[in-house]
């Protein structure tokens, strides 16, 4: 009896064989492109996927994936520009930790900017969100955003922040009196968004009030962002059920803004940076002491006089050079940026920043010797695609430290036996994946009110 499936079987085998041959040819052709390029150990079968996967598996739970790139650079002693062949799972990338190359890519002959997928931020934010915006629209919107977020504009609006800063102090006092551990991430998120709302919209969302109705909605929204489909589904249903509350507050704020003549757009600030400022200052009490002395000197040892001066002479914030240096040094050590221009790797190069793993804010003081090499410190990027919210981000963090550092001690209390990364990445306070790298577990702290405050 003749096999009626014989021709079909033959055709199937030939088709499969042809497809496999094409895959092999394409793989070999692609891998050969990296044969003479600087890469970590590279195989014809997996490219650099094996190296990256091994690094991810060796990292603690929830580790922020971009920091694996710096670990790979160190482990294999890679040059300041190297390649990661991640095809076909991910796009292959060129990792840049060289200031001159970064300048060329962003200022001399600007390349297409990295664009975040709007799906990462939905349903809270749409494709019009600034990180998901097309380059042509970014170019159109960026000048207006920069004009609304100048250092002068931020200084002028500082006096409006007094009620919010008082609410922040009250919350910290309540946490201190409770004697309980508290994930400081929650309060810092509220603070950053509150400051952005006051400075850019001229109105408060009352996020720092203990009875805020809007605060838990925003927290849920931020927790929802990411790639976990189950968490996104669960939280998205909850968010959609309560958007009427959020929309009402925003509409009222925008209407009030229109009536008072204020304008601006909410920008994304590096919330993660506040966590690490506290973490590094706790680990370096000498820097904390020097920063407190600067606050006494520039403003007043008396808290009441400090508040009065802050409202009457907000330009004094510009004289907090060491406090700003603390913020910048934290940005250098925990810089994020993209996978192409790797700010973290650039900030950890010993030839650019002597003793690169040490927390040394003095390197950013005016007149510091050696000075910061040109184009090597670029946490907000440069050129026409730079972050428009950098003045707001820096000033809001300086204000945060001025408001809290002399009155409170925030002591991290990570669980005993908690996983940890390399010490140069924070140890138990390693960067955990979120929109940005937040301190692991939301940085649980004990808040102590200082006796001499």
Swiss-Prot record:
Annotated localization: Membrane
GO molecular function annotation: heme binding; iron ion binding; monooxygenase activity; oxidoreductase activity, acting on paired donors, with incorporation or reduction of molecular oxygen
Name of the featured protein: Cytochrome P450 monooxygenase PC-20
Cofactor: heme
Highest taxon, organism lineage: Eukaryota
GN (gene name): PC-20
Keywords: Heme, Iron, Membrane, Metal-binding, Monooxygenase, Oxidoreductase, Transmembrane, Transmembrane helix
Main location: membrane
Topology versus the membrane: Multi-pass membrane protein
Pfam families membership: p450 (PF00067)
Function (record text): Cytochrome P450 monooxygenase; part of the gene cluster that mediates the biosynthesis of the indole diterpenes penitrems. The geranylgeranyl diphosphate (GGPP) synthase penG catalyzes the first step in penitrem biosynthesis via conversion of farnesyl pyrophosphate and isopentyl pyrophosphate into geranylgeranyl pyrophosphate (GGPP). Condensation of indole-3-glycerol phosphate with GGPP by the prenyl transferase penC then forms 3-geranylgeranylindole (3-GGI).
InterPro entries the UniProt entry points to: Cyt_P450, Cyt_P450_E_grp-I, Cyt_P450_sf, Cytochrome_P450_monoxygenase
Gene Ontology BP annotations: mycotoxin biosynthetic process
Keyword Lipoprotein: no
EC number assigned by the record: 1.-.-.-
């Amino acid at each position: 009896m003749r096999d009626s499936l014989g021709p079909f079987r033959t055709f199937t085998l030939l088709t499969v064989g042809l497809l496999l041959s094409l895959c092999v040819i394409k793989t070999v052709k692609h891998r050969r492109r990296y044969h003479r390029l600087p890469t970590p150990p590279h195989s014809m079968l997996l490219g650099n996927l094996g190296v990256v996967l091994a690094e991810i598996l060796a990292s603690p739970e929830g580790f922020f994936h971009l920091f694996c790139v710096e670990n790979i650079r160190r482990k294999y002693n890679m040059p300041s520009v190297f390649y990661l062949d991640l095809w076909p799972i991910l796009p292959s990338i060129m990792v840049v930790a060289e200031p001159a190359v970064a300048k060329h890519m962003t200022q001399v002959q600007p390349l297409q900017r990295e664009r975040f997928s709007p799906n990462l931020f939905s349903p809270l934010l749409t494709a019009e969100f600034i990180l998901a915006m097309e380059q042509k629209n970014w170019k159109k919107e960026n000048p207006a955003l920069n004009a609304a977020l100048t250092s002068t504009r931020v200084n002028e609006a500082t006096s409006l922040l007094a009620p919010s800063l008082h609410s922040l102090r009250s919350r910290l006092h309540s946490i201190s009196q409770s004697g309980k551990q508290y994930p400081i991430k929650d309060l810092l998120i509220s603070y950053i968004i509150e400051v952005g709302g006051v400075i850019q919209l001229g109105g408060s969302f009352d996020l720092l009030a203990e009875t805020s109705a809007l605060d838990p909605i925003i927290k849920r929204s931020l927790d929802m962002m990411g790639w976990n489909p189950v968490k996104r589904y669960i939280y998205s249903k909850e968010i959609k059920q309560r958007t009427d509350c959020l929309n009402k507050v925003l509409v009222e704020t925008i209407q009030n803004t229109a009536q008072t003549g204020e304008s601006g757009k909410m920008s994304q600030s590096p919330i993660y940076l506040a966590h690490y400022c506290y973490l590094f200052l706790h680990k370096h009490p000498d820097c904390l002491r020097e920063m407190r002395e600067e606050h006494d000197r520039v403003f007043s040892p008396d808290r009441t006089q400090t508040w009065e001066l802050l409202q009457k002479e907000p330009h004094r914030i510009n004289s907090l050079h060491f406090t700003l240096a603390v913020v910048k040094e934290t940005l250098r050590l925990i810089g994020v940026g993209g996978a192409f221009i790797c700010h973290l790797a650039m900030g950890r190069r010993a030839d650019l920043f002597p003793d690169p793993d040490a927390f040394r804010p003095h390197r950013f003081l005016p007149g510091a010797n050696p000075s910061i090499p040109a184009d090597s410190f670029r946490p907000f990027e440069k050129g026409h695609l730079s972050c428009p919210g950098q003045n707001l981000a820096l000033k809001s963090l300086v204000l945060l430290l001025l408001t809290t550092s002399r009155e409170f001690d925030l002591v991290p209390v990570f669980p005993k036996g908690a996983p940890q990364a390399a010490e140069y990445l924070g140890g138990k306070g390693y960067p955990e994946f979120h929109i940005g790298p937040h301190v692991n577990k939301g940085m649980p702290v004990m808040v102590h009110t200082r006796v001499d405050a």
